[in-house]
Amino acid sequence: MPVVWPTLLDLSRDECKRILRKLELEAYAGVISALRAQGDLTKDKKELLGELTRVLSISTERHRAEVRRAVNDERLTTIAHHMSGPNSSSEWSIEGRRLVPLMPRLVPQTAFTVMANAVANATAHQNASLPLPAETANKEVVVCYSYTSTTSTPPSASAPSSSSAAVKSPRPASPASNVVVLPSGSTVYVKSVSCSDEDEKPRKRRRTSSSSSSPVLLKEVPKVAVTAPGPKTITLPVSGGPKISNLMQSIANSLPPHMSPVKITFTKPSTQTTNTTTQKVIIVTTSPSSNFVPNILSKSHNYAAVSKLVSSAALTASSQKQTMVISAGGSSVAPGPGPVAVTTVVSSTPSVVMSTVAQAGSAAVKVASTRLPSPKALIGSPSQILQIPKAQQAVLQSAAPKALQGSISTAQSTALAAAGPGAKPTIQIKQESGVKIITQQMQPSKILPKPSSAALPSSSSAPIMVVSSNGAIMTTKLVSTPTGSASTYTRPTVSPMGTRVATSPAGATYVKTTSGSIITVVPKALATLGGKIITTSMVSGTTTKITTIPMTSKPNVIVVQKTTGKGTTIQGLPGKNVVTTLLNAGGEKTLQAIPGAKPAIITASRPITKMIVTQPKSLGAGVQPSTTTKIIPTKIVYGQQGKTQVLIKPKPMAFQTAVVSEQTRQLVSETLQQVNRSAENNTTSTHTSAAAAGLENRDDTHTYTEGSPVPSDSTHDAPPVVHLISSRGQEWAEQEVSVESSPALIYQELTAESQSATSTIKALLELQQTSVKEKSEAKPRQHTIDLSQMAVPIPVSAEQRESPEPSGQSAAESDAHTEFIPIGKVSKAAEVSASSTPGQSASAVSAAPHVVKISTAAVTTQQVEAQVKPQQEQVLVEECELEGDTLDPQTGLFYRSSPQQQLSRVCEAASSSSSSSSSSSRRAEPPLTVKILTHRSSSSAPATAASANTPHTPQLPRLQQAPTTHNRPNTHTQLSQPPPLQAHHPVGSSKTSSGAQVQQPIITQGATVTKITFGAPHVPRAPVSSSSSSEAALKLQAESSSEKPSVPDILKISMMEAEIDPGAEPMLVDSSSDCGPLTKAPAGPSLISSSKQTLAHGPFSRKSKELDIIQVIPQYSIMPDSSQSNVVVEPSGFLEISDYTSQRLDEEQAMEQEVDSSNDEGAAASPSADQSQ
């Protein structure tokens, strides 16, 4: 025959050798597989294989490895089982044994071990609630990708979602096809394409009325919704196709492990406004076009149907124009994917979504959060998670689109208390089972530094916060509506177009806007921790920040406020005290207290907004809201009805920090300075009006300290701020109580050493330089007064009484929290989340600590990146974690004597350059705090060094030496003491005043010896936590906090946080009166030291506020853990707040995003701050 093709190919000898070897190996492997499938190894087969090994040049090791492969192949094993019966692998197993057995290896210890363990524990906990893999073998996994084109109509949208054949969908059009092509081009094999069945079973509520088959369909907005048949739903908006594919890919990669059946709905941004979404998903959009709002929004936000987001099934696909009204009542044109940004995140179990719509005219922000229980660890409430979405979804939005409205919906109870629409700001509070989100937006946008978005005169951008608990990804997007009221979020408006959401399922999810403002960063670990997510939105890279930290089981309250208008109103929920303070550009502060909320939040005048989140989940109906503190740019808000909340902002991720950090820092520093001045001016004048005027409260802090009677009431209110910390516990109410008590102590310490704190903050430094020394000397008495006041209110507080119940949990969970929080400290959000996680899973303290560590590590890592002090951060984190291990679980403080000392030394070295004494004292605190101190001292050193150093300089050495030793020992002592103290707590509350008083002077003395004070307060704190310590502590904190707020603004409050921390801690100690006296000498100094350190830190932290925040957060975290521990953490947290006040704002936002979890203030409030902390 003629040769049709060449018989010799262009192959070199080497190539031929390689191909031959491949053929030989494949042939041998094929023979082994065939013989294995026939049955057990016989003598004949063995001889045949021996011959083949020689012919094919197979080594003995290769032969044994192939045999092991065949033996371990379930497919071959199954075939052999059917062909030759059971027990057909014994000889094969013998033949496949290794000549040299593998040596057992030690478990490697790396920097990520703690994080990995925490994640593994969290995942194991979640998986424990899932069916065994064997039980799911025959179940269909549904992955639906709906890629709807922009032109698809709502009906068509519903069709594509059901058929999962979208116009543009790359996936095969036939619903029966087994392959789904992701937009990114990757393919997913699915057993069944129909998403509806899977979804209906797990969550009928999620089903949208319009389309049963589509879990989430968002037409208007580019969105990615991933819904697990379980309670997990993740929806991510994507502005661009490629981004969508990336999101899709990341979601697909990350979600599958956590959710068994995963439903992914990918919707390309479409002009259609109708969205069919499962109830769980709440979409918040501020879109130029009124029809843009997804029906979910329309339904939930629908003014006419204000309350019906509750039932998922009830969710109507039809989008309401009314919702549109909110976005831009006037604009009917859909800007397309660019202008509209919608982010919805539903966590696997709990789904929490915050929606904010900025109206053109009224710049209204609406937030709807579905219950935020973390799916696995929530002790609350698997059932709640399922139920709540429906009930919680209901959002009351009573205001007309033009009038900003705060609408509050409680997940559990439909009862919503809608405060009258605020003058300009609109506040929406939604309480989900685990999370309460309050969004407040002011119409006028004094905040926005750039009117760049002014370009869109009609677009007003409102931050969108998505909170998911339990590993849900949270994204915050700033979207601008093409409305006349672009004032507030002008810059964000630009960002909506340029927003891009990058989500790594496990990693941080952040949305970045073209304008450069940072939207959200959610650290993976935090998200994974479950129940903790922090979303931070910075508007025009300045003051607007939205942070939500969903607690796994306890509700979080997130208040997002923008200072757009002159008047700011805070709305509270009926039965729950929510205090929100907005800082107006004008500097006006209007506080709307919820009935029962005693303290008003005080805000310093500044265009920066302040957010406070307070929510009692179950604790004292409205009286004790477990609060998530929102960090306010340059402002701290204290005072929630019985709890004091400290707003701590976590430092933003490195990338975020870079973008907004400078501007924010400037704003913060300016604000701080202003606050300082006002504080100085107002210090004497307004301690009484602490509740009344947020700004003045700060200033009044000093006065408050002096005038203890008035502050007591205020303080009571203030404790809610502290409360946030405690809210970290799984039972928000209960844990909050325990945490609260710690924060209360902190606040007192701050109050006592408010001057120190002030010095910490630059403005405070100035204010305090004059008064720091005076107050440091006189402060002890003031502290004492404060403490006593606090003590008095504590016993009086109903919260306190409630707190005993929680305190019981708190005692048990508090320990978990403490361990958990230290890492959480890094990000308050993490902390809160951690706290809540432990609380939720009363199951495992150990697990909680792991989680906390994870969040800390993640937060720290991110924060460090932001701070550019990763090493220090990591060290801090590690130390924190290690220390946590070292310390008793009760204290929850992770202190390592050597690491801590090193850290303090390092911090001192760092701060020595700027302000050695103040930094060292701060550093002396906990390692985390120490590091932060160093950074802070670098930035604030000049201003703070003088004021802080003077009072603290002598103490610094002590702090350094003692912090490690005292702090450590104190911590240990406290740790050992906490249980008794906790048991003693109820009694302690009355004693608190005396103990606190005693300790306060100590604190004052130990202004430099912050560490020592820390230790002592911690012990008292734990006791407080245990009985009604959280309540009492919170109350104390609230009291101190109210007092402190009166002093200087945020600065003072920050200072108060720092100082009050010690003071508050002592107060907590007071609560556990034993603690106060017992740890009095050591504790007092310790507390003082911590507050002083915090104060010193405040200024320094401005520069290195990110680190500071992180460090502080661990301390903060620690505090929640045990009342005493909490105390320790809180002081730093407060300090961080101070820092946050000035510079930390950015960081906090970033942190919050990371943690986003919000609680810690992180949850949006400071969840992130603390969350990030």
From Swiss-Prot:
GO terms for cellular component: nucleoplasm. Residues 149-177, 683-693, 911-921, 937-953, 1025-1040 have a biased composition (Low complexity). SMART domains: ENT. InterPro entries: EMSY, ENT_dom, ENT_dom-like_sf. Residues 16-100 form the ENT domain. It is found in: Nucleus. Residues 149-179, 191-216, 676-720, 797-816, 905-998, 1020-1046, 1139-1173 are annotated as: Disordered. The keyword DNA damage applies. Its main location: nucleus. Keywords: Chromatin regulator, DNA damage, DNA repair, Nucleus, Repressor, Transcription, Transcription regulation. GO terms for biological process: chromatin organization; DNA repair; regulation of DNA-templated transcription. It comes from the Eukaryota. Regulator which is able to repress transcription, possibly via its interaction with a multiprotein chromatin remodeling complex that modifies the chromatin. This is BRCA2-interacting transcriptional repressor EMSY. The gene is emsy.
